[in-house]
């Protein structure tokens, strides 16, 4: 029997919010945001360059904003942003920024 190990998130998500574009994709079954949100909360920043990854790692300590980018499909990118005070995490499409 395999045991699933659930890790504690590296930071609080606060209130979870998704934009209209993300909500539409979720409602149509074109996007399951949960795996990407888990990755974000675990400190897996997705498709960022080294500089942005280091900025996020530093922001975990300093309390600055956290940003992740995930290439869901060749034509679909999902951004996740957690505010500096960890009060809100927003899931959005780049076109909605």
Residue ranges and their predicted role:
Residues 61-97:
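Short, compact, well-ordered microdomains
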Residues 2-67:
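Compact soluble domain cores
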């Amino acid at each position: 029997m395999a045991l699933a190990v659930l890790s504690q998130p590296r930071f609080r998500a606060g209130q979870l919010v998704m934009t209209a574009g993300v909500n539409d994709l979720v409602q149509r079954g074109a996007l399951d945001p949960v795996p990407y949100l888990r990755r974000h909360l675990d400190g897996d920043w997705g498709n960022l360059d080294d500089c942005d990854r280091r900025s996020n790692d530093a922001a975990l300590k300093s309390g600055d904003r956290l940003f992740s980018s995930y290439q869901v499909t060749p034509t679909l990118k999902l951004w996740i942003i957690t505010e500096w005070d960890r009060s809100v995490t927003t899931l959005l499409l780049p076109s909605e920024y």
